[in-house]
Amino acid sequence: MNASIIIPTYNEADLLPGLLGDLKAQRGADFELIVADADSTDTTRDVARASGARVVDGGMPAVGRNAGARVANGDILIFLDADVRVPRTFVRRAVAEMKTRELAAGTCPARPISKLTTDRIIHNFANLFIRMNQRSDPHAAGYCLLVRKDAFDRIGGFDESLKVAEDHDLVSRVSEIGPFRMLDSTFVRVSVRRYQKEGRIAYALKAIKIGLYRAAVGEITEDSSVVDYDFGDFSEDDARGSRRVLRQIERGLIKLDRQTSRLDERVIKGNEQRPGAYDQWQRASQSLREAWDALFDSEPDGENAPERHSDR
């Protein structure tokens, strides 16, 4: 068997059928499907079993993914979140590229399931960040993560003591025994419901905070109060307030998107060493700084507008 697809779930009866339908429609792919469920209170387990998936007991994402991996028979483990969508050729192309490039681990570009230009820009920049750092500081979001089974077992799987960023930690450790790269042949479409719950700006700031803490202090464990994370909790929605602010900074972010898209194309072609690529990265960084300044220099109306705080 070429691959084992492992999906950690908690109360995903509404969105899981979309992904299961995509997987059922896969062409030319040999894989098994495993759902690791964290004791859902809805019909998630019934939905999974009806699709032919093997259901095992899960928990937090790292726990669920490890539980699925323990019973997996595939040479390549493909970890997907329950709310993603994949093209019909996803499994075949992903597995083929992993084998052709002899990768130990990989991820793939993300496209948001959203009509907001801002969401597209955010994901374009995130994709570029992963590509630019795939050799020196590997990152991979858990919504799409591929790992050779032998490499996964060798490093002991996901660190279940971590509260967040267990996906980044995993690919960092895997990269010590084999290459990690972003795949070029396929992609996933990802939900923006976490943005909608926490707000785009708040979510971005949380991501920055996590990155800085990991770089300066270390991994964030379950008993840490550095950030909050509630697996499967999407009950709140403050997207309306976020939209008001985002419309005002969108023009600045579009400038950034043009730069990052051009550079991303160069990285894909393997032209990272060209001086022109470095110069373009510098311009993209400058555009990001300008967009950030525009965010805090704007004066949005309405009670949901964020206040600017200064430590000075």
Where are these regions (language model features)?
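Short, acidic, metal-binding catalytic loop of nucleotide-sugar glycosyltransferases
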Residues: 21-30
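A conserved acidic beta->alpha catalytic loop
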Residues: 22, 37-45, 84
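Conserved donor NDP-sugar-binding/catalytic core segment of glycosyltransferases
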Residues: 89-118
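Acidic donor-binding/catalytic loop of UDP-sugar-dependent glycosyltransferases
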Residues: 43, 80-96, 172
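Acidic donor-binding loop at a coil-to-helix junction in glycosyltransferase catalytic cores
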Residues: 164-170
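Short aromatic/hydrophobic "clamp" motif used to bind/position activated sugar donors
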Residues: 77
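Glycine-rich, basic loop-to-helix element that forms the pyrophosphate-binding segment
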Residues: 57-72
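A recurrent flexible, glycine/aromatic-enriched loop bordering the glycosyltransferase active site
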Residues: 110-117, 128-150
